[in-house]
């Protein structure tokens, strides 16, 4: 395994492991159960045909838990947009096409997105909500419709890679089952409100904000055109999307905004 990472995210680093494989090493503090969950979800995604990337199981390196995957030779959709800004509409549409492809897969082997969302209400990230508010949010989420489509829950251009033969979706650690509208609502929320990487300058935040708005417009236009999800569906899942975003990631700079959004969603009923 290489000594320097070839990619880095919020929770893990990726290292080359020979020519054909990579090791995704979680940062210290990520427990073995979380990694085991990602192994199971990644293997299921491959089994269902929604990713060609094979998962070769878990490893431990210097006390850090990790996973061995096939190495893919491609670039993320974000890089496509960065190389040619005129391709932003195409990138947004491609993102929708790949999301629809994921949602055509169905399973009874993943947890229900509604129960995962309700479970987040007991995490420290959601502690700003009062007990009465948490109960109200839980009732709202449990009243949402059931489903068995595969949902990704972290679907954005950096998790879709463009290869010569096809596009590939990566990072299945948050995969669940449910209504596709839940997943699309999370992607919409990510484009609208998610924090950019720390250290991004004010001028670049303006640029990235404009890019996000363009990508979101073409992503939603393409996804909604399929007719399986409506804007009203996305709005109904908005409160669950905020709970999932905050509970699963707990990004400090997003806490106040997500809590305020949850309260606004409750008040809008």
Regions found by a protein language model. Give the residues of each.
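Hydrophobic "anchor" residues on beta-strands that sit immediately upstream
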Residues: 20, 66, 148-150, 167-168, ...
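Acidic active-site catalytic centers that drive phospho-/nucleotidyl reactions
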Residues: 24, 38, 154, 171, ...
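An alpha-helical support segment within catalytic cores of ATP-dependent transferases
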Residues: 104-153, 163-164, 168
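Active-site Asp-x-Gly
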Residues: 166-212
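Helix-rich C-terminal or lid/interface subdomains of diverse kinases
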Residues: 191, 198-269
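Short, glycine/acidic-enriched loop or turn micro-motifs at the edges of active sites
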Residues: 73, 155-157, 174-175, 186
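ATP-binding pocket architecture of kinase catalytic cores
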Residues: 4-111, 145
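Hydrophobic residue at the +6 position relative to the catalytic HRD Asp in the kinase catalytic loop
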Residues: 158-162
């Amino acid at each position: 395994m290489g000594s320097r990472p070839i990619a880095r995210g919020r929770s893990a680093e990726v290292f080359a492991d020979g020519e054909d494989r990579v090791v995704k090493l979680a940062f210290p503090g990520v427990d073995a159960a979380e990694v085991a969950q990602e192994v199971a979800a990644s293997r299921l995604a491959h089994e269902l045909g929604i990713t060609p990337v094979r998962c070769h199981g878990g490893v431990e390196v210097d006390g850090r838990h990790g996973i061995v995957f096939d190495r893919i030779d491609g670039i993320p959709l974000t890089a496509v947009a960065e190389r040619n800004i005129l391709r932003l509409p195409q990138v947004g549409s491609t993102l929708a096409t790949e999301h629809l492809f994921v949602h055509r897969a169905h399973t009874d082997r993943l947890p229900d997105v509604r129960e995962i969302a309700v479970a987040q209400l007991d995490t420290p990230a959601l502690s700003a909500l009062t007990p009465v508010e948490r109960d109200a949010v839980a009732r709202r989420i449990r009243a949402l419709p059931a489903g068995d489509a595969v949902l990704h829950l972290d679907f954005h251009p950096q998790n879709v890679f463009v290869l010569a033969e096809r596009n590939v979706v990566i990072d299945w650690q948050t995969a669940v089952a449910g209504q596709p509208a839940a997943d699309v609502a999370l992607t919409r929320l990510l484009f609208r409100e998610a924090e950019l990487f720390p250290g991004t300058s004010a001028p670049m935040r303006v640029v990235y904000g404009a890019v996000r708005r363009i990508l979101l417009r073409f992503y939603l236009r393409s996804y909604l055109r399929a007719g399986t999800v409506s804007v009203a569906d996305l709005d109904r899942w908005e409160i669950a999307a905020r709970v999932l975003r905050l509970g699963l990631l707990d990004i400090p700079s997003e806490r106040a905004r997500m809590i305020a959004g949850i309260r606004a969603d409750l008040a809008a009923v």
